[in-house]
Amino acid sequence: MMEQKCIGKVTATESKPTTCTSVYFWLSPDVIIRPFDLVRIEHISGDGSGKSYSYAIVRELSYITDSAGHLANYVSSDFGDITAQPMNERLGTTIAEADVLGNNRNIEMPIRDGARVEWAGPDEIRDALGVANLQQPIPGGYIQTSNKEEIRIDFEARYLVGPEAAHMNISGISGLASKTSYAMFLLSALQQRMPNDVSIILFNVKGPDLLAIDQPSTSLSDAQKDEWHKCGLDPEPLENVTYLYPYAKRQERCFTSSHAPKDVIEAQIQQDRAFNYYYDVETFKGGEAGNETDVGRDKMSLLFSDIDDPQSTMESCIQELGDIQAETWDKLREEIRAKTAKGQAGPKEIPVQSWRKFSRLIRTRTTHDVFSSLWPGEGRRQKLVVDAIKELRPGKILVVDIAPLPDYLQCLVFGDVIRTVFDAKLDLYESINREDLGRVVVFADELNKYAPSSTGSRDRTLTRWLLEVTERGRSLGVVLFGAEQFRSGIHSRVLGNCSTDVFGRTNPVELSKAADYKLFS
């Protein structure tokens, strides 16, 4: 192994010895280094022949002098004279504290005092980080060290999208953390490297941010394009994208309530890539038990995910909907309202008061235009969510716009998509072949809205479904990529099942709440 320039030597003292996992070293005065730089350190070989190398990542830097205290420095400056020049400079050096990552001969003994410290080379850094010999590398970015080396960092696909491990979480404050930007970079990497294996579903949760991802960016500078090339990727827009917008009775807006510019939607319609999703009664209320539409009754509970229901009375009402004969939402609301007068007889009796509460909620929460019937005419371009998922294939992307919807409808649509994909992977839909979907990656921002850390004594329906996805989805091929501002606001089991965590810029309040940030302290 080629010998590099020596930049310092290990120091082990009585009060701060080296250990199996940590090491201290002083630096040559002309060396510039920073936290997260990687170095290699000479170590014993184990068999007495030659030497081995340990690799460490710098965690903290400190400068120490022979001064007994700050007051001594004050006195040495002629008792506080800021213009005084010292006769002799104090003896001092920079001390680096580093965490040991490993050894090229698997030596786990503490590093000896006086051991030579050198810059680690690019190949050594990749090997120390465990990304040197990946079976299917997915570019995750690159790092630049203080000695101007640039090293590409990859993920192993088997641990990012399964089947060995799966799910990713991105956290950081709004705007500055670039959560969505990094997620889009990673999804582009998946599409470029695994076009025959991975399909993608995105949720647009704010403004028109993700409603033109198949269009080239006009703001991408040459320097940014070079950064893509350093990662081994082409700085190109995503391909094979279909957009689902919330249906609305607004012909002048292409029958949608989306915030996307009208000219953008019209261009997508011309290319047959834009549709308006809606919910009809039959699909939503469910059919007979055992029918594939029976899951609709489960999804209806998402409408009330923010309503306290300790006695599960609303769930009981929902389960009775399959017996109601109704072809339109008006008819369904009318049939439910009829039950508020007489209730139900028999062993499954539901109190009239419960039906009245349920009727009131159904009436107020199904007035949005998205609750509709299929209208004739191509101009409306209506499509059920399940039909859009049936058409999903590896290499394709489905963008679902939920930004203009109120929170309870956002939870409904998000949960509907998650449950439909999960059930399709369980072969609960006769019309969907689970192998045709490939491995489905679902990306959602503001994950804390759907899986909050505190939901009372009982997790709500959507949270339970997300827990099922993160706990069982890896083996089925359903992968969740989530992002949020505050990691501490996410359900602990959802976080615990994520094999990959990405940390963006955050604030001191979040640092004090989320235990995971102790890794960086």
Ranges and model annotations:
Residues 202-203, 207-213, 242-468, 475:
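P-loop NTPase motor domains
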